[in-house]
């Protein structure tokens, strides 16, 4: 893609947008960087690119921003029904999403993971499996390292393992992974995608350009994910925690097996997998399937599963103070993710929840408390909504507390906990009402826990 001298507008100046600006500048494009937020809000983000030859635009979108523009590249956070997208379409300006743009530069094969929950763990785990073969691998995408950096650095013999979100899949055109995987699909981001059916179909786009000789790995146990198999033109490889499969990854006699064309091979005993929880077994099956289909040996897969310690902000053990354990699950940004965190812990729980309202319902989340959640500390925009749902299911009013900050929530949680309890931050909501992202929320939680020792 020749971009020298072309006028390119990057819409959205988060992590991906900043990366796009840097790469486009290095390709000698004339870059316009635009965000609807004002400069003061973005000042910190812009430090990296303020010395480059970039023309900045901030605030409410104006049609003249697109004057003479050859290409618009969208960051994932920019909705496809925004004014900038509509105007670019009216003016017939080429419009590419960040992932689609990056894909067009890729020399290395991309192994793409999506799903509502477990994406980051599965992507990181698969990345470790590739790394343990001794080959050069880049772990990128929605996981924090922008895909555009990975494709620019990766050579032909390297591998790219990418976590891909629904926001990123919404704008693909030719994007075609070597192997794709959908871990699960439960309601999320309905504020953006409007209906669950639309969200499901966007997730299914991950394999829409794959050919007959390529694979998509799908969760056999999740009816919504498995229903997408009929849309696939490529081969479908299932994984299951509950059923024995003639062809696929499955559990038999307490061990993971993978069978390809009827030839089954034992991978590992479940008790040897380092990361705990049923949801992590699902992640292990998904990552192992992609790795095995990529030609990685059962030994390498097993050794990785024995040593991989999980990811930051996902049921991450933080500390134990006076017999009370603290877990950071800031990555629990929807009810289903937080249900899995509650199920993974075996002790009584003091739960810190609440945050930005994405339009989620909290009925199943509250039902999962099931005698395990002894106190509920609520923060953020959804605090009252979760409280009202808890009341509906007769959760004791006296066991619900409110906190104005996360630091206050941590103090209240510690005061409410006894020896043998766990304090779990698993908000079931996004972080954007109080924090820049879930990582910042998780770091503030860990800092607040450390303060308890002072």
From Swiss-Prot:
Localization per Swiss-Prot or TrEMBL? Cytoplasm
Q: What GO MF annotations does this protein's record show?
A: ATP binding; UDP-N-acetylmuramoylalanine-D-glutamate ligase activity
| Annotated protein name in UniProt | UDP-N-acetylmuramoylalanine--D-glutamate ligase
As recorded in UniProt, its EC number(s) are: 6.3.2.9
Q: What's its catalytic activity?
A: UDP-N-acetyl-alpha-D-muramoyl-L-alanine + D-glutamate + ATP = UDP-N-acetyl-alpha-D-muramoyl-L-alanyl-D-glutamate + ADP + phosphate + H(+)
Principal subcellular localisation of the protein: cytoplasm
Which UniProt keyword terms apply here? ATP-binding, Cell cycle, Cell division, Cell shape, Cell wall biogenesis/degradation, Cytoplasm, Ligase, Nucleotide-binding, Peptidoglycan synthesis
Pathway membership: Cell wall biogenesis; peptidoglycan biosynthesis
* Keyword Cell division assigned: yes
From what organism does this protein derive?
Thermoanaerobacter pseudethanolicus (strain ATCC 33223 / 39E) (Clostridium thermohydrosulfuricum)
Q: Pfam families in the record, alphabetically?
A: Mur_ligase_C, Mur_ligase_M, MurD-like_N
Q: Do the record's keywords include Cell division?
A: yes
Q: List, alphabetically, the GO terms of the cellular component aspect.
A: cytoplasm
Name the InterPro entries on file.
Mur-like_cat_sf (IPR036565), Mur_ligase_C (IPR004101), Mur_ligase_C_dom_sf (IPR036615), Mur_ligase_cen (IPR013221), MurD (IPR005762)
Q: What does this protein do?
A: Cell wall formation. Catalyzes the addition of glutamate to the nucleotide precursor UDP-N-acetylmuramoyl-L-alanine (UMA).
List of residues binding ATP? 115-121
GO BP terms, alphabetized: cell division; cell wall organization; peptidoglycan biosynthetic process; regulation of cell shape
